[in-house]
């Protein structure tokens, strides 16, 4: 069974990477083969957290997509777009820095998928107003979302899994992860000129945008107030997740339901903007990866790698960093972390105890979160952003993303390794 699972997964991944076939079709077809071959049971598809569809992710995306769709009808995205351009004096690099910082902060406080859903429409409007290619901006924002989301417990789904299995708190993540994220963010800002390239705004459009009054962009203040109230409540519930223990997916769906009820919009007004292709792609991808988990392929690889360390703590941390980032970049960091957590638990118990046991959890979190920047399908935020780009008429190819992502991931891992070594082995 494991040979069939590996063959189907590799073939499907190659087709997704080729950009020649709809990735949604590929994912659903591969998922159907996995189920048809008996690798993943029909019950597992719908009810298994490790081998089936992660409904928390699906419903979180659906709820936030509906909220963002309703929010579009207020004109607030046009307002923010004009404000950002004027604030940066229409300079593309300054605009990119501003949007990247907003994305990173939003991802840390909320979660990276929600932030991407909110920032992408603003970015597309800014680029459209200035007549510049939106691809560098969207790619940079995805990188920032994965980096910024690593800072807190609620910022990235893998962090939530790690916190649950290791008994870590919101404050633990803030104290131990945020410093590393700050260092990597500084490096990412330094890479922005390279990511931007030779993009320049059209002079005529710059003059037109600078002359606009952003307040005139708001054309439904009543709906904006309703959206604002719902978003504040939704975001507050996200932040209070460790206390309330209410799943973010449920919060997002409740928020979407309230907005739909009181917005006065027609059903087609908010459902037409939902990224149905993206949701179906995720469903298929979860089953594809679940087949590798179900057959024990991922666990066997992880165990074989960790046995090589022989109890050396520094080598173990380095191995976790070196293995987790590329593997997370290939099979999606959420199911990978779900599989690795019991293995790290065993590792912690087997170590001699010269460094704090949580060091291994921070290594897993940093490598899995930053590994999410490696490929176009490595993290939920990546898939969502590329789906939005495709629908806007500016598709981003798998390899265009990966060429940039490989560099950003490599820099992030080197800085993470130095951070872990200095903090926990030299000064710890």
Curated annotation (Swiss-Prot):
Keywords: Cell membrane, Membrane, Transmembrane, Transmembrane helix, Transport. The chain crosses the membrane at residues 26-46, 51-71, 90-110, 135-155, 177-197, 223-243, 278-298, 314-334, 359-379, 407-427. Pfam families: CitMHS (PF03600). It is found in: Cell membrane. This is Uncharacterized transporter MT2759. It comes from the Bacteria. Belongs to the CitM (TC 2.A.11) transporter family. Its main location: membrane. The lineage of its organism: Bacteria, Bacillati, Actinomycetota, Actinomycetes, Mycobacteriales. It is a multi-pass membrane protein. One of its GO terms (cellular component) is plasma membrane.
